[in-house]
């Protein structure tokens, strides 16, 4: 297919048109008074959202060059959401402002490479200043404030996330699911839970709840299938003498071995239960090792030269209780040593930092949560499916932003932190580098300007008032239309969100500004289908047999 090559200002101007169209669609969602965007779906009802990244992902432009510009900024919004959980609209608005201002200067004759160098230096200085301005999240109230702002000022969601984080800790896993009612709920599973249920309903001890409940059990961990009971007999005899329950976690328990365990359970000889080990392959081995460390036991593994016959009571783990239903097993208060658990947690954290696979990262985070304090499930309720999707998006955003706040701290929100950071930096640059730095500094006003515009206020007056305020915590509360102490009013942002949004915006804008040529496919208009209306006279063929 033939390609079209466009150079210099003409190429950059076309790219800018695409960025502008994307920005115009996304920026209306910004701030507490941001508007909704209605998105047509290929099937079903349209979706309504106030989430910047959801809007950005839907923007697909007809002109291929404009679409190239839009798709680069769309990628920035998406990347910002992945890294920080929020700040997608901020990143888009900043990228547009930097590109617009930079384009004007480059068209007037500035050197794009020098301009880029100045932009990078300014960005570095502002990020350093943001880190200085940040402060730790001190309590549940501040967690709720961050979550509320990221959930588009929904206090109920903010409080729900704060409750969840308080119960499972900052390393705990918090998942978001759709509720079956219109009410929001929070369910917390304490201890380690994995998705394997009892191997036989005959193990059930609580017929009303259909669960197996074992009090202070021993836990045997084996990484292969158990088919022959003879291998198990030595350890079963030792358990019988103690009078305590036993939970067996193995790859599988088959045939005669399972049948004999069930018979012993029914006769009251042993209080016993068995479940399959969670996961598959290498992940199964890792999770068995996690359970061993949590319960103070050892995995009996033939790879390490151990056989099931050689297992003793000293190899078994212990816990204060184990609850098993048909789908899940929960181990509460494992008897493992805290130092060993902490070492395992740090090992998994290091693996999370190194992995490049999103799937592996998700599974490692699940293992981390299971070891460090449980899982919280936020169930989101709504009256309609459209409302449910929109609300679930907001809860996901708020959750990620809250984790970012706990990780790196908070700064004042509402676009004010970028303006305060700008006022503190002093760069000694010359020529086009100085122009590049000035472009970034001017663009830092764009988020606050947009928040004020969306709320119906004079953006110039608002920006000027915040810039000239004597108290460095003063900002603009767009919901009330007042200048307030942002920290006292609970209008705060995670510093990670501001930092990532700025870095990504400068990165994409400088890429676009240093673009000197674009190559795109020439769309060929397909010929229209021939008009069939002139064939109406074929009725005369009716005499054919």
Swiss-Prot record:
CC per GO annotation: cytoplasm
- Summarize subunit and interaction data from the UniProt record for this chain: Forms a cylinder of 14 subunits composed of two heptameric rings stacked back-to-back. Interacts with the co-chaperonin GroES.
PANTHER family associated with the record: 60 KDA HEAT SHOCK PROTEIN, MITOCHONDRIAL
| Localisation | Cytoplasm
Record organism: Campylobacter jejuni subsp. doylei (strain ATCC BAA-1458 / RM4099 / 269.97)
Q: Which UniProt keywords apply?
A: ATP-binding, Chaperone, Cytoplasm, Isomerase, Nucleotide-binding
Which reactions are catalysed by this chain? ATP + H2O + a folded polypeptide = ADP + phosphate + an unfolded polypeptide
Q: Which residues bind ATP?
A: 29-32, 50, 86-90, 414, 477-479, 493
Q: What is this protein called?
A: Chaperonin GroEL
Q: What does this protein do?
A: Together with its co-chaperonin GroES, plays an essential role in assisting protein folding. The GroEL-GroES system forms a nano-cage that allows encapsulation of the non-native substrate proteins and provides a physical environment optimized to promote and accelerate protein folding.
What are the recorded Gene Ontology BP terms?
protein refolding
InterPro entries, alphabetically? Chaperonin_Cpn60_CS (IPR018370), Cpn60/GroEL (IPR001844), Cpn60/GroEL/TCP-1 (IPR002423), GroEL-like_apical_dom_sf (IPR027409), GROEL-like_equatorial_sf (IPR027413), TCP-1-like_intermed_sf (IPR027410)
Which Pfam families does the entry mention? Cpn60_TCP1 (PF00118)
């Amino acid at each position: 297919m033939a390609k079209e090559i466009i150079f210099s200002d003409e190429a950059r101007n076309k790219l800018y048109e695409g960025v502008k169209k994307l920005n115009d669609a996304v920026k209306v969602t910004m701030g507490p008074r941001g508007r909704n965007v209605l998105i047509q779906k290929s099937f079903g009802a349209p979706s309504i959202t106030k989430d910047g990244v959801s809007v950005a992902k839907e923007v697909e432009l007809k002109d291929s060059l404009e679409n190239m510009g839009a798709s680069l900024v769309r990628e920035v919004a998406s990347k910002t959401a992945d890294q920080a959980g929020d700040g997608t609209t901020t990143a888009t608005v900043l990228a547009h402002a930097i590109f617009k201002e930079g384009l004007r200067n480059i068209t007037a004759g500035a050197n794009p490479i020098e301009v880029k160098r100045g932009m990078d230096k300014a960005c570095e200085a502002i990020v350093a200043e943001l880190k200085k301005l940040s402060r730790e999240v001190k309590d549940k109230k501040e967690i709720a404030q961050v979550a509320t702002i990221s959930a588009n000022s929904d206090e109920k969601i903010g409080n729900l996330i704060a409750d969840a984080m308080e119960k499972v800790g900052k390393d705990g896993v918090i998942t978001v699911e759709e509720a079956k009612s219109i009410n929001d709920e929070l369910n917390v599973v304490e201890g380690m839970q994995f998705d394997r249920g009892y191997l036989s309903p005959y193990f059930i001890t609580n017929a009303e709840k259909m669960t197996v409940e074992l009090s202070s059990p021993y836990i045997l961990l084996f990484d292969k299938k158990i088919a022959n009971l003879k291998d198990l007999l030595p350890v079963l005899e030792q358990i019988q003498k103690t009078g305590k329950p036993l939970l067996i976690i193995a790859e599988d328990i088959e045939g005669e071995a399972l049948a004999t365990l069930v018979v012993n359970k029914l006769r009251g000889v042993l209080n016993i239960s068995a479940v399959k080990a969670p996961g598959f392959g290498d992940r199964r081995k890792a999770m068995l090792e996690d359970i061993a460390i949590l319960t103070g036991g050892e995995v009996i593994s033939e790879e390490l030269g151990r056989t099931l016959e050689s297992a003793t009571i000293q190899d078994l783990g212990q816990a204060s209780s184990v609850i098993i239903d048909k789908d899940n097993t929960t181990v509460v208060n494992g008897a493992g040593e805290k130092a060993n658990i902490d070492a395992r947690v740090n090992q998994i954290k290091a693996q999370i930092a190194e992995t490049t696979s999103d799937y592996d990262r998700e599974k490692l985070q699940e293992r981390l949560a299971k070891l460090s304090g449980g899982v919280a499930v936020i169930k989101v309720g709504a009256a309609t499916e459209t409302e449910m999707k929109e609300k679930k998006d907001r809860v996901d955003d708020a959750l990620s932003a809250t984790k970012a706040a706990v990780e790196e701290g908070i700064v004042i929100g509402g676009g004010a932190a970028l303006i305060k950071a700008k006022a503190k930096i002093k760069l000694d640059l010359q020529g086009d580098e100085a122009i590049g730095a000035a472009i970034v500094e001017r663009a830092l006003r764009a988020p606050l300007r947009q928040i004020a515009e969306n709320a119906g206020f004079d953006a110039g007056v608002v920006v000027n008032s915040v810039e000239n305020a004597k108290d460095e915590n003063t900002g603009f509360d767009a919901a009330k239309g007042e200048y307030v102490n942002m920290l006292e009013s609970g209008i705060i942002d995670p510093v990670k969100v501001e930092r990532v949004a700025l870095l990504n915006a400068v990165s994409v804008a400088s890429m676009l500004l240093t673009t000197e040529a674009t190559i795109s496919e020439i769309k060929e208009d397909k010929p229209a289908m021939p008009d069939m209306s002139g064939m109406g006279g074929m009725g005369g063929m009716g005499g054919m047999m």
